[in-house]
Each structure stands twice: as C-alpha cells, then as structure tokens.
Amino acid sequence: MAGVTRGKDGAVGILTLNEPESLNAMTPDLLGALGEAVGEMTADPAVRALVLTGAGRGFCSGQNLKASEALGQDLVGGVMKFYWPTFKALRECRVPVVVAV
C-alpha cells in the first residue's frame, strides 16, 4: 500500500516516503499521497519547514517501472496527470522544503 508517513519535530514537518520494499519507487498512488501530505502539512500554521525523506535503505529509486503502464501511451500526458500536481505542491509550498537523502 502506497503511503507517506507524517510527523512533526517542533515547527518542522517530516514526510517520509514509506515504500521501502521498492526503495520508495514512485507510483501514481505514492505521488498522490505525497501531494496530499504536503498540502496537509503546509495548512498547519505551526509548520515552518518540511523535511522529505525515505524509509528503508534508499530515498527514492525513481519511477516504479511496474507502475509505468498507468502513464499510458501518452507519456507527457501521464507525467502531467500524475507528477505535475505533486511537483506544483512542492514548488508552491509556503515553507522551505529540505530533502534528506
């Protein structure tokens, strides 16, 4: 099951990609969960920074090739549908985002 765990350490929100069996490889579900988690964390006025990290022995191994069929034949359209909302949420985040690799 795709997931992103959420935590806080003082004013720092901590988001952890939690698919260690695939080295946190990106899937549409994981991307959606990440975008949702970014939105939830940044809606909290007490959060002044975000740290994004990965569970297990790797931060993120890239695109999960087994899930690539969800992108369909139109690769650009697939990227826009699944990746762009999450990238946009990170880019427009009101607080600094630090990636702990």
Q: Where are the model-predicted features located?
A:
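Hydrophobic beta-strand anchors of alpha/beta hydrolase catalytic cores
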Residues: 50-51, 59, 98
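Glycine-rich beta-to-alpha active-site loop
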Residues: 86-101
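Conserved CoA-thioester-binding segment of acyl-CoA-metabolizing enzymes
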Residues: 1-55
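A short, structure-level motif marking secondary-structure boundaries and short turns
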Residues: 22-23, 70-72, 97
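Hydrophobic pocket-lining residues within nucleotide cofactor-binding pockets
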Residues: 26, 65, 101
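Glycine- (often His-adjacent) and acidic-residue-rich active-site loop
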Residues: 39, 54-89
